[in-house]
A protein has these predicted regions:
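Amphipathic alpha-helical linker/stalk segments
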Residues: 67-92, 126, 141, 145-151
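Amphipathic C-terminal alpha-helical segment
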Residues: 107, 147, 151, 168-190, ...
């Protein structure tokens, strides 16, 4: 009797399990030690089964990153959606970004910390189109902050673009430091109340970036 074809939901669940398993291997052993055979072994299937869903480990890497940035974008827009006021929207997105980083440490690591191949590493390869898609997903998240912070800047043109990008990346580096030092538990080594520090530091960073409107 022929095997019943998998439903679309079952296929997506299997693809998701493969990505979750690959993510765990990358976090534990590094990207260089990731292999299709190792993923298959952990899932109790053959390597051929994995190849039915993904071409190679580079496609898996990019799909994990795409999935992560989709999760981040959805969270940012969900938190910002209730607000029409730009300042409230910005505050909501900042808190959503921190929430994402602290509650999804494995995804945050592969998206922002680990030395895994990214778009520029795939330029000129067969997988460049997928890498481009991954980069565009990442930039969508960045552009949410560029648009929000840019609303405070009265002038236009390249001068504004450069100024806003600098401010956003500077702010992003502060957020990244907060999340990374929390996830690595280094804050726990020097602070008695990490949660209170995170709340206070978050408020301080938001206040500092909003002050940009006072310059003009």
């Amino acid at each position: 009797m022929p095997k019943t074809p998998m439903t679309k939901e079952e296929i997506e669940n299997t693809r998701g399990r493969i990505l979750d398993t690959a993510l765990n291997i990358i976090i534990e052993e590094g990207f260089n030690n990731l292999s299709v055979r190792k993923i298959a072994s952990r899932l109790g299937v053959t390597a051929t089964t994995i190849y039915n869903y993904y071409t190679n480990k580079d496609e898996i890497n990019l799909m994990i990153r795409i999935r992560g940035f989709e999760k981040l974008y959805d969270l940012l827009t969900k938190h910002a959606a209730p607000f029409n006021d730009n300042e409230k929207k910005l505050k909501a997105m900042v808190r959503a970004y921190i929430e994402f980083g602290l509650t999804n440490p494995s995804y945050y690591d592969i998206m922002f910390n680990l030395h895994t191949p990214k778009y520029l590493d795939y330029v000129g390869t067969d997988i460049e189109p997928l890498a481009h898609t991954e980069k565009q997903n990442a930039l969508k998240c960045l552009h949410l902050f560029i648009e929000s912070i840019g609303a405070y800047i009265p002038f236009k043109g390249k001068k504004k673009d450069h100024f806003v990008l600098y401010q956003v990346v500077k702010f992003w580096s502060d957020l990244h430091g907060l999340i990374t030092l929390t996830n690595s538990r280094l804050f726990h080594e020097v602070l008695d109340d990490v949660e209170s520090f995170i709340r206070q530091r978050t408020s301080d960073m938001i206040e500092n970036i909003i002050r940009i409107k006072e310059i003009f």
